[in-house]
């Protein structure tokens, strides 16, 4: 969930706005059986502070939205991509509830590792954020193994590009070996966008 070049940014809703938006998100998550929501504070315009749904951009506003989401859908994942006003390290205690109770996972921006906020552990943090299209982020087996041994809970891959298929699979295989000591099997088929038809990989 991220901005859309308008005023309704994820870290600039009022308490009321956060509460109502959380209810709407919960309805979508349940209707479409989604795992949950992930917030990314970017691509938002400055808010009109005369609008009661909006507030000044802040870590508090972002924390409030995550808290409200967890309150209204405790069975769903509420996670965070560290950017803008929303970083795991700057999440705030809301109504006596620590971030570790309303933020399930946190992931850093390109090529980094997330740090735990108040009440969080490294297990709730991604040890690496790997952007496959640009090739950013360390995907070596040794780094994956060391991050796992340090206590990080997961890795994040994003921005897959079919035109770079072979190199992207290789990077995933390397990380898999470091995290699980297993070999990721090279796929033999794929699906084109919006298709349910298997296509053989040549």
What name fits each language-model region?
Residues 1-202:
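Secreted glycan hydrolases and related glycan-binding modules that recognize and/or cleave
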């Amino acid at each position: 969930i991220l901005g859309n070049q308008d005023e309704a940014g994820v870290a600039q809703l009022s308490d009321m706005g956060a509460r109502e938006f959380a209810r709407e998100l919960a309805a979508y998550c349940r209707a479409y059986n989604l795992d949950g929501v992930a917030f990314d504070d970017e691509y938002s315009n400055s808010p009109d502070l005369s609008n009661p749904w909006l507030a000044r951009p802040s870590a508090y506003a972002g924390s409030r939205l995550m808290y409200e989401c967890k309150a209204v859908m405790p069975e769903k994942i509420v996670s965070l991509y560290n950017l803008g006003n929303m970083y795991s390290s700057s999440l705030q205690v809301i109504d006596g509830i620590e971030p570790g109770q309303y933020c399930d996972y946190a992931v850093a921006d390109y090529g980094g590792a997330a740090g735990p906020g108040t009440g969080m552990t490294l297990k709730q943090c991604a040890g690496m954020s790997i952007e496959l299209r640009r090739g950013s982020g360390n995907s070596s087996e040794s780094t994956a193994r060391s991050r796992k041994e340090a206590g990080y809970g997961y890795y994040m891959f994003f921005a897959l590009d079919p035109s770079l298929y072979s190199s992207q699979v290789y990077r995933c295989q390397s990380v898999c070996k470091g995290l699980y000591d297993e070999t990721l099997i090279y796929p033999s088929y794929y699906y084109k966008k919006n298709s349910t038809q298997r296509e053989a990989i040549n």
